[in-house]
């Protein structure tokens, strides 16, 4: 993790971030203004995360993507101007990203992340990967966990989206309303029976939480008695994520509308194989699940990108309890759920 320089907020920055400073405090904003973030994958979800971090006021954001702009990107990637087909996605996103907040340093990196050394990641406070295969996610997460770098990953598949966080051993503060005790003069009166909570007076409470690596969260032994007892409470989107990540690993891409019939059949086969290998019922996912997993839908990107951006801001500012460790969103029902999976 990079060494933090002394944070100073100028008058111009104080005016720019006035609303945020009122929300989470000057010290939290100072932490953001000294933070460097790596964002990998500039598709629709990546664009949403980039927007939220730039507007929040991090010090520097690096957009890393070696892929070229495709027609599919026009569905949800609002940072890429029309007429950019064939250009590098990170470079095509750069101008609009910088215009969101000139106070944030935004750079593009067009190199393939697979060719980055372990040392490359140590210059960042947060590393966030989107639209990446599981083996790459596990590798980068291992590097980040080793060097105490906050790690996030997120994906959107059609109506479904998810995010995962590994913050290692994370300390933060929560703002709580101050409870005042009854005065001795009225301890025998009716007021003594009431706990007085003054919402206008608050205190900061320090807390600590431990996160597990992504590998542990993905490799749960669902045949164990402990896991079986938790299965009914586990969101089915966790298993859907496993299926879609296996598809990405096998095909080197996500399900595409242009090959809908072929990909739907393959998803059903992969689903059967994955659920069987995990030791869970083949009926865990509905038979029509494949119909809702194609393309990045802009509204789902907005929701998941909003949550992902919010969690990164919370992790950097050390304010408020983080989501530990998964967040799943179902666009069909407009429901989101946080669940902790894989922790000991």
UniProtKB/Swiss-Prot annotation:
Entry annotated with the keyword Ligase: yes
Pathway: Protein modification; protein sumoylation
Swiss-Prot/TrEMBL GO biological process terms: protein sumoylation
InterPro entries: ThiF/MoeB/HesA, ThiF_NAD_FAD-bd, Ubiquitin-activating_enz, UBQ/SUMO-activ_enz_E1-like
Keyword Nucleus recorded: yes
Principal localisation: nucleus
Family classification: Belongs to the ubiquitin-activating E1 family.
Function recorded in the entry: The heterodimer acts as an E1 ligase for sumo1, sumo2, and sumo3. It mediates ATP-dependent activation of sumo proteins followed by formation of a thioester bond between a sumo protein and a conserved active site cysteine residue on uba2/sae2.
Protein name: SUMO-activating enzyme subunit 1
Protein source organism: Xenopus laevis
Gene of this entry: sae1
């Amino acid at each position: 993790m990079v060494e933090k320089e002394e944070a100073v907020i100028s008058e111009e920055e104080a005016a720019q971030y006035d609303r945020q400073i009122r929300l989470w405090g000057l010290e939290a904003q100072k932490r953001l203004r000294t933070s460097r973030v790596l964002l990998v994958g500039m598709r629709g979800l990546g664009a949403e995360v980039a927007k939220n971090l730039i507007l929040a006021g991090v010090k520097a954001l690096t957009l890393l993507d070696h892929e070229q702009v495709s027609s599919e990107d026009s569905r949800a990637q609002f940072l890429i101007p029309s007429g950019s087909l064939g250009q590098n996605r990170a470079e095509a996103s750069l101008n609009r990203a910088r215009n969101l907040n000139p106070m944030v340093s935004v750079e593009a990196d067009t190199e393939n992340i697979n060719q980055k050394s372990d040392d490359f990641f140590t210059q960042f406070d947060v590393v966030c990967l989107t639209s990446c295969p599981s083996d790459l996610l596990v590798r980068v997460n291992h590097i980040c966990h080793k060097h105490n770098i906050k790690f996030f990953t997120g994906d959107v598949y059609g109506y479904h989206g998810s995010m995962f966080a590994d913050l290692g051993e994370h300390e933060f503060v929560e703002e709580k309303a101050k409870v005042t005790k009854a005065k001795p003069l009225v301890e025998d009166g009716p007021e003594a029976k009431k706990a007085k909570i003054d919402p206008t007076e608050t205190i900061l409470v320090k807390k600590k939480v431990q996160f597990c690596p992504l590998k542990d969260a993905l490799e749960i032994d669902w045949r164990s008695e402990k896991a079986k007892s938790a299965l009914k409470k586990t969101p089915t989107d966790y298993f859907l994520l496993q299926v879609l990540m296996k598809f990405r690993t096998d095909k080197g891409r996500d399900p595409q509308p242009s090959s809908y019939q072929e990909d739907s059949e393959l998803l059903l086969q992969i689903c059967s194989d994955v659920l069987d290998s995990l030791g869970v019922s083949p009926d865990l996912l509905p038979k029509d699940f494949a119909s809702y997993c194609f393309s990045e839908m802009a509204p789902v990107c907005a929701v998941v990108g909003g949550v992902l951006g919010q969690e990164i801001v919370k992790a950097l500012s050390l304010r408020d309890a983080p989501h530990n460790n998964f967040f799943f969103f179902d666009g069909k029902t407009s429901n989101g759920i946080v669940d902790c999976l894989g922790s000991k």
